[in-house]
Amino acid sequence: MARPVRGGLGAPRRSPCLLLLWLLLLRLEPVTAAAGPRAPCAAACTCAGDSLDCGGRGLAALPGDLPSWTRSLNLSYNKLSEIDPAGFEDLPNLQEVYLNNNELTAVPSLGAASSHVVSLFLQHNKIRSVEGSQLKAYLSLEVLDLSLNNITEVRNTCFPHGPPIKELNLAGNRIGTLELGAFDGLSRSLLTLRLSKNRITQLPVRAFKLPRLTQLDLNRNRIRLIEGLTFQGLNSLEVLKLQRNNISKLTDGAFWGLSKMHVLHLEYNSLVEVNSGSLYGLTALHQLHLSNNSIARIHRKGWSFCQKLHELVLSFNNLTRLDEESLAELSSLSVLRLSHNSISHIAEGAFKGLRSLRVLDLDHNEISGTIEDTSGAFSGLDSLSKLTLFGNKIKSVAKRAFSGLEGLEHLNLGGNAIRSVQFDAFVKMKNLKELHISSDSFLCDCQLKWLPPWLIGRMLQAFVTATCAHPESLKGQSIFSVPPESFVCDDFLKPQIITQPETTMAMVGKDIRFTCSAASSSSSPMTFAWKKDNEVLTNADMENFVHVHAQDGEVMEYTTILHLRQVTFGHEGRYQCVITNHFGSTYSHKARLTVNVLPSFTKTPHDITIRTTTMARLECAATGHPNPQIAWQKDGGTDFPAARERRMHVMPDDDVFFITDVKIDDAGVYSCTAQNSAGSISANATLTVLETPSLVVPLEDRVVSVGETVALQCKATGNPPPRITWFKGDRPLSLTERHHLTPDNQLLVVQNVVAEDAGRYTCEMSNTLGTERAHSQLSVLPAAGCRKDGTTVGIFTIAVVSSIVLTSLVWVCIIYQTRKKSEEYSVTNTDETVVPPDVPSYLSSQGTLSDRQETVVRTEGGPQANGHIESNGVCPRDASHFPEPDTHSVACRQPKLCAGSAYHKEPWKAMEKAEGTPGPHKMEHGGRVVCSDCNTEVDCYSRGQAFHPQPVSRDSAQPSAPNGPEPGGSDQEHSPHHQCSRTAAGSCPECQGSLYPSNHDRMLTAVKKKPMASLDGKGDSSWTLARLYHPDSTELQPASSLTSGSPERAEAQYLLVSNGHLPKACDASPESTPLTGQLPGKQRVPLLLAPKS
C-alpha cells in the first residue's frame, strides 16, 4: 500500500486523505529504518501483542533474549529464587511484571526497568519481610501484590515515601504485628489495602492514617475486640471487611471517623448484640452484614445512627423474637434478611417504622403462632413486595395474619405443613402475583372450600401444590381436583376451645391457676402448651385431663390447668393456652395476670410545729406494685388554703409536700394516702402553726361620765392562745366589786365609773412566742342630769333648734303657696301622728329620710311610746324604727340644752315682704319647749304640749301643705310651766328676745340667694326642704350663716333626736361640749311644726 503512494510522488494530489496518509508514512519511515525489523519472541516464551508469557516453564533464571517491546512480562509458576537486574536493562516499555508462585525471598530489583513498572505481582513466594530500600526504585509502582508470602510483621520502615502505590495486597501472610504508622508512607496514594488471612489479633488505635483509602480488608484474622477510634484517620473509607474474625465485642465509637463508609461486613464473628454506641458515626452506611454471629436480641435503639441503611442481613443468628418497634428507626431499610434463626415470636408492631422495606426474608425459622393466631404482626410494612416464610412451622393461616400487606406481590409459604386456611386470608392482597404453597396435609372440609376457586380466579394455581390428607375419601387428591360439594364438615377434627382462661389479679406469694378446655372428635394425640407473652413456657407446671364430652363418646373434652406457685412480679404477663393435634392448633384468648403488692410506707409524715411565715415540709413515700399513687388531704378533705393561695407545692416525682409562707389557717391534720389496685394505706401528721399574739380589733380610747358603765375589749389572737393581763398605768389592775372580767380576760367591764377610774389601761397579751401590749385611755366626765323644770342651756343648742324650726316654717309656706289647697289635720295629745297624704311619714315605707348623722345620744332604758314623756321623766321612742342600743354603751357627753319660747319676728317680716311667705308668728303663737335627755337618748316634752314631727323625704318635690294657718295669739306668749329654770352659769328669766339674734338673718339671706318655687307651681320643682337646709346642697350654701359662728354652733346646728323632736334645753352652761358619740343607723329627719288645735 505504501508503494503506490511512493510511486505517485510526482503525480498530482488527488485527495486530502491520500495526502495525509503519505505524510504519515514519511514520518514513520526513518524510525522503521533505524529500529529495524521487530525482534522475535523469546525461545522459551510465547508472545501475544506486547505481552511476553514465560510462566510455567520451570525456569530457574531469566531468559536471555527478552524483546525490548515487552510491556507485560509473565514469569509466574517458575523456580526463580532471585532476579538478575541486568536482564531488564533493554526493556524500556515494561509496565507489568508477574513473579508470583516462585521461590523469591525478597522483593527483587528490576534494574533500569523498575522506575517505569506500574504493577508488580509477587504473591505466593517465600518473602519474609519488606524493606523500604527495595521499593524506592519503583517510582511508578501503583499495584503491589505480596499476598501468600511469609511476612510476619509490618513496620513503619517497610513502605517509604515515594512509590505511588494505590493497591497493596498483604493477604495470606503470617502478619501478627502491625506497627503504628506502618502505612504512613503511602498516605498520599493508597486506595485499597488487603490484610485478610493473617494472624492479626489486635488493631492499634489510629493504626491507619490513610485519608484516601476506600477499601480495607481485614477478614479471616484473629481480632477479638474493636476498640474505639481504631479506624480514625480513614476519612474516605467506603468498604470495611471484618468477617470471619473472632470479634465478640464492639466498644462504643469502634467505627468513629468512618462517616463515608457504605458497606460493613461483620459476618462469621461472635457478636451477641449490636448496640447504638458501637455503630456511632456510621451515618452513611448502606449495607450491614451481620450473618453467622450469635446475636440473640435486637435492641430497640441499636440502629439510631444508621438511619440511611438500605440492607440489613441478620441471617444465621440466634434470634428468637422480634420485639415491638425493635427496628423502628430504620426508616430507609429496603432489604431485611432474618432467615435461619429461631424466631418464634413476632410482636405486634415489630416492623413498625419500616415504611421503605421491600424484601423481608423469614425463611427457616420457627414461626407458627404469628400466622396462625396473631393479627397485626406485619403492620407498618406498607411498601413490602416480597415476603418469604419458607420452612417454618405454620399449620394454619388465620384470616388476618397478613393484614397490612395489601401491596404484597410475592408470598412464599412453601416448606410448611399447612392444614387449613381461613376464609379470605389472602383476599386483601390485590397485587399478589406469586403465592407459593407446598403441603400434603390439607384438611379438606367446608372451611377450605373457598380456596381452590379463588386461586384459579387469581391465576395463582401454578405456584400451589396442595394435597388433601383428610377425609380418607379425598386423601392424596389435589385441592383443585376435588369437587366443591365434597368439601363438607361432618366432624371437627381440629380442637375447638370451649373454656377460656380468665384474667386475674393476685398478691405476691399467692398461688394462681389458669384453666383451658377444648373439644375434638379426633382420636389423634393431643398436646398442650402454655404461652406467656407469645413465648412458649418450656417448664410449665401443668395438669391435663380428658373425658368424654358427648353421650355417644365421639367427642372428647381436653382440659389443661397451668399452676403458678407463689407468684412474683416476674409472673406478670398475658397467658394463652395452645391445644394441638394432628389436624392443627387452637389458640385461646390471652388472659392477663397482674401481681400486686399492698402499698407500704418508706417515709411517713411526722407532726411538726412551726411559726407563721416559715415553710412547712411533710415527707411521704411508699412502695408497692403497681407503684402507688400518693395523695394528700387536710382535715379529711381536699380544701387546702395554701393551694388556693398558691403556696402549696407537690412535686409528682418527689416525696416532699411543701407549704410556703405558712399561715394560721394551714394548721390541721394532713393525711398521706398511698393507693394502688391492691389497696390503700394512710398516715397522718399534725401541723401546728405558732403565731405571736395580736389584736383582732384595735383598742380605742374611751370617754364616759361618772356613774356609767364602760367596757374595754381586748380581743386577741395567737397560737398558743395568749394569756391576757390588764394593767392600769404601770401596775396590774386592782379588781373591785365594780370590775368584771370574762373567763378569758378579753373583756373588762367597769360599772358605776368614778373619777378615780380614769387613766391608761394596758392589755398585755403573751404566749410562748412573745408578748404584745395595747393601750386605751379612759376619760371620766362629771355626771350630768336632766330636769323637767326647763333650765336655760347654751346658746349653741338654741341656735340649732331655732334654725331647724325656722327652716320648717319656710317649707310650710312654700308648700302652701305652690299647692294652693287646704288640708286639715288634727293633732291630739296621743301616741298617734297624723300625716297629710302627700307628706311621707318616717314610720311608713314611703320616701327616704334625710341622712343626717351629726350626733346621737344613747340611753340605757328600753323603748317607749312615740314622743311622750312618762311619769318617770323618760321620753319614749319608736322601737320599730330604731334598734335598741347597747345598754353598756357610753353615754353622750352633750350638755342638756334649753330652748326658749320667744321668737324674733323682725327677720321674718322682711322675708314676708320680699317673698310673700308668712313668718313664724303667723303659724304658731307661743313656742313649745322640748328637752332632750342627753344621758338617756330620749326626748322630753312638757306635759300638755302638742308638738308633732313630720318627716319629709328628700325625693318628695311637692309635699302638701296644711289647709291654712291656724289662728294664734301673740308671739310673746309663754306657757307658765315651761319657763327656763336658772342654772349655775346664769339665768334665763322669761327667755326674753330671740335665741337666734343673727341666724335668722343669715337664713333669710340664704333664701334670697336662691329663688324659691313659684307660687303658681311653675318654678323649679327640685326646690325641696332637703335642699333648703341640707349642708351639702349645691343650691343653698349656708357657709356664711350657720358655719360662720363659733365651732359649737357649727356642730350643733343640725342636732335632731331620733324620733324627730327638737331637743329641750337642759342645764344651760356658758360653754357647750359637742356630742361625740354616734349610734350606727341613726338618721336625722327634717321636722314640720304643727299648730296646736
Swiss-Prot record:
Ordered alphabetically, the record's keywords are: Cell membrane, Disulfide bond, Glycoprotein, Immunoglobulin domain, Leucine-rich repeat, Membrane, Repeat, Signal, Transmembrane, Transmembrane helix
Ig-like C2-type domain location, by residue? 495-594, 599-688, 693-779
The cysteines covalently paired via disulfide bonds are: C45-C54, C444-C468, C446-C489, C516-C577, C620-C672, C714-C763
Signal peptide annotation = 1-34
**Where does this one sit in the cell?**
Cell membrane
Q: Which residues lie on this side of the membrane: Extracellular?
A: 35-794
A cellular component term, taken from the record's GO annotations: extracellular matrix
SUPFAM superfamilies cross-referenced by the UniProt entry: Immunoglobulin, L domain-like
> Which residues lie toward the Cytoplasmic compartment?
816-1093
Tissue specificity as recorded in UniProt: Widely expressed.
Question: What is the membrane topology noted in the UniProt record heading this document?
Answer: Single-pass type I membrane protein
Q: Which Pfam families match?
A: I-set, Ig_3, LRR_4, LRR_8, LRRCT
The UniProt entry, under CDD domains, shows: Ig, IgI_LRIG1-like
**Induction record:** By EGF.
Q: Which residues form the LRRCT domain?
A: 440-491
Main location (coarse class): membrane
InterPro entries the UniProt entry points to: Cys-rich_flank_reg_C, Ig-like_dom, Ig-like_dom_sf, Ig-like_fold, Ig_I-set, Ig_sub, Ig_sub2, Leu-rich_rpt
Carries keyword Nucleotide-binding? Answer: no
Q: Where are the transmembrane segments?
A: 795-815
Keyword flag Glycoprotein: yes
Quoted from the entry, the domain comment is:
Contains LRR and Ig-domains that can mediate low-affinity interaction with EGFR. The LRRs and the Ig-domains are each sufficient for EGFR/ERBB1 binding. This interaction is abolished only when both the LRRs and the Ig-domains are deleted.
Kindly state the subunit structure of this protein: Interacts (via extracellular LRR and Ig-like domains) with EGFR/ERBB1, ERBB2, ERBB3 and ERBB4 (via extracellular domain). The physiological relevance of the interaction is controversial; LRIG1 may have low affinity for EGFR, and interaction may occur only when high levels of both proteins are present.
Function, as annotated: Acts as a feedback negative regulator of signaling by receptor tyrosine kinases, through a mechanism that involves enhancement of receptor ubiquitination and accelerated intracellular degradation.
Protein name (Swiss-Prot/TrEMBL): Leucine-rich repeats and immunoglobulin-like domains protein 1
Q: Gene name?
A: LRIG1
